[in-house]
Amino acid sequence: MSAQREKFFRMPKLKPFHAPDGWHSPGYLPHFDGGEIPQFITFRLADSLPQALLDKWREQLRSDDCYDDAALRKRIELYLDQGYGECHLRDPRVAQSIQNSLLFFDQDRYRLSAWVVMPNHVHMLLTPGPDQDLSAILHSLKSYTANEANKLIGRTGQFWQPESFDRWIRDADHFAKVIAYIENNPVKARLCTKPEDWPFSSAWFRKRGGK
């Protein structure tokens, strides 16, 4: 692996261990804009979850007393891995276009440490660059990839669900676990037998020396 690609997968230097400032809630998911702190991001296709589940999700988020973020995330991940919806990202042209877009701003707007493009969702582990706003990064990325994907498959209309999940990385152990989770997602979803066999992922990319 080249020195540049090796640097690409190193753990960023974390700030002191504490829950950082920067939380906001523009929709019905809490989000975190915390500067140069690694973030685990998930965004998904507009039709990737049943409406009944979305309604239940919104209701849970209205009640601070009963909302269990970890349990809700686990249930949503389970639904995503079942491949609900049209799964436009199964099209290799679309998946490759999205992967290219993720890599385009690496080392510029953010530092990308891991990613995977699944049939109906995308996982990323990134660290925003200096003075880069996470919400702006995701808005730009999702807007561009939606337009390109719609062109490739000859459709119009909403492509991504507006809301995204983001979770800040606590420490080096958490960082390593998130990379493993992201890269094993295709195996867990029974799309391949080894992480490096999935072509739209950091595992595949790293196995081939970052080429």
Q: Which residue ranges define each predicted feature?
A:
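Short catalytic/metal-binding and nucleic-acid-binding patches
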Residues: M1-K211
